[in-house]
A protein has these predicted regions:
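Short, Lys/Arg-enriched segments at the junction into DNA-binding effector domains
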Residues: 3, 114-182, 186
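Short hydrophobic/Thr-rich beta-strand motif most characteristic of the beta2 strand and flanking loop
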Residues: 25-32, 40
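Acidic catalytic/metal-coordinating carboxylates
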Residues: 32-36, 59-62, 86
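Active-site beta3 strand of CheY-like receiver
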Residues: 44-50
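Receiver (REC) domain active-site loop signature in two-component systems and cognate sites
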Residues: 55
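Basic, amphipathic DNA-recognition helix from helix-turn-helix-like DNA-binding domains
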Residues: 64-65, 69, 74-142
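Positively charged, aromatic-enriched patches within helix-turn-helix-type DNA-binding elements
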Residues: 154-231
């Protein structure tokens, strides 16, 4: 049973959402401001955080920033404002996904399950004959000094922890497993975020940008992956 921390100041909303998600099999804990959420994370482990953007005491964006300073667990942001700036800022700070209120209950549950799947298992890959990576029986994946451990969801570059979020880990893993192949934004959105790509949806682009910032320069001077305008990533 996945443990979910819901951080939202709307008491009536949290009661309804807790009832819904409990029926879906999630174990829920609710707090009503960002500071309470940070304190809860200090003392207990959770599989996913649902974080409201507009809150008193400490806003959702500021709470997310402090979460990312210490934790890599997935965060799904909720907001009554479908504001593109809020969405981009949240993704830049490391949110795994963003759902505007009011939302379709089934869509929210699907997004949550997609996040949890990608933080506990490897994404699907396509077959290719010549592989320039090594994957051994301990489920580690190696390429150009980067080593990924699927079971532990940990990534290293030359032995140093890369401190990736669950979404960044899954994205890097899929790119490494399909090195040399063009992966479209549509495919990455579906496989990594669990949703179809919509017009003006830049979630994948923001996750790629965050991943690039965390990866050091390769010793051979080559880019980790290339952006192919209108086609995807290579």
């Amino acid at each position: 049973m996945s443990k979910i921390l819901l951080i939202d100041d709307d008491i009536e909303f949290t009661e309804l959402l807790t009832e819904l998600l409990s029926l879906e099999g999630f174990k829920m804990k609710v707090v009503h401001n960002g500071l309470e959420g940070l304190n809860e994370l200090e003392s207990n482990q959770y599989d996913l955080v649902l974080l409201d953007v507009m809150m008193p005491v400490l806003s959702g964006v500021k709470t997310l920033k402090r979460i990312r300073q210490k934790y890599s667990l997935p965060v799904l942001m909720l907001s009554a404002r479908d504001d593109q700036i809020d969405r981009i800022l949240g993704l830049e700070l490391g949110a795994d996904d963003y759902v505007p209120k009011p939302f379709n209950n089934r869509e929210l549950v699907a997004r949550m399950k997609a996040i949890l799947r990608r933080t506990t298992s490897r994404p699907a890959s396509t077959d290719h004959s010549e592989q320039n990576y090594t994957e051994n029986i301990s489920k580690s994946l190696q390429f150009a000094g980067v080593e990924l451990h699927s079971g532990r969801q940990q990534a290293y570059y030359q032995g140093c922890d890369l401190d990736l979020t669950g979404t960044e880990f899954a994205l890097l893993q899929m790119l490494m497993r399909n090195s040399g192949e063009i992966l479209s934004r549509e495919l990455l959105s579906l496989k990594i975020l669990g949703k179809n790509l919509t017009p003006y949806d830049r979630a994948i682009d923001m996750h790629i940008s965050n991943l690039r910032k965390k990866l050091p320069e390769r010793e051979d001077g080559l880019p980790w992956f290339k952006t192919l305008r209108g086609r995807g990533y290579l």
